[in-house]
Amino acid sequence: SLDRRQRQMCIRDRDCHYQLNGSFTGDSSITILKDFSCKYVILGHSERRSYYNETNLTVKKKSKICRENGIQPIICVGESFIRRKDGSYMNFILNQIEECIEPNLDEVIVAYEPIWAIGTGETPLNKEINEVKEKINLFLKNSKNVKSAKFLYGGSVDSNNFNEIIIGSDSDGALVGGASVKEEEITKIITNADFN
């Protein structure tokens, strides 16, 4: 039922500042997020990287302050259409992971959002999503000594493809963008989602 699914949800934010508190217009401070019992923060989204020139180092600083304050960062990674086509996408993604994520963590959540799929209505094939998931998980385990990793997919996720992507790609969840601000779409996703 929808009520049961609502109880499974929690508060998350779309970004934060890398200092604990202060006057950072347009950014949420960790102190405020804690006051609202925020459990997750999305960091390194492609729009933040593009519009605000956010770097991997900035994402790493934000991730560190989140972890120090009991908030789980969701680290976004993903490639452009050009990188996908020229075959350099995996090196690009793993470099983002290398530079954004600290070693020796108990748990990491990575959201794979191919930039070419965001808002375009196009999504990679499930086998392509799985390839990225497998390489990221292997890299986190072998190069970063991460104990547990969760993998989310984001990029043109909507009520028509949510279950197919989550089940078909063996993702642990989705980063829903444009569809999340459309009441009818997000209600359909929540109502029809196969959480088994």
Regions found by a protein language model. Give the residues of each.
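Glycine/small-residue-rich loop that forms an oxyanion/phosphate-binding "nest" at active or ligand-binding sites
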Residues: 12-65
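Glycine-enriched alpha-helix->loop->beta-strand junction motifs that scaffold or abut catalytic
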Residues: 8, 37-41, 72, 167-174, ...
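Short acidic active-site motifs
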Residues: 28-29, 160-161, 185
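Glycine-rich phosphate-binding loops at beta-strand->alpha-helix junctions
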Residues: 152-161
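C-terminal helical cap(s) of enzyme catalytic domains, especially alpha/beta-barrels
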Residues: 62-67, 168, 180-196
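Single conserved hydrophobic/aromatic residue that forms the stacking wall/gate
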Residues: 1-11
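Glycine-rich phosphate-binding active-site loops on the catalytic face of alpha/beta enzymes
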Residues: 42-51, 75, 79, 114-116, ...
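Active-site rim beta-loop-alpha module in soluble metabolic enzymes
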Residues: 69-145
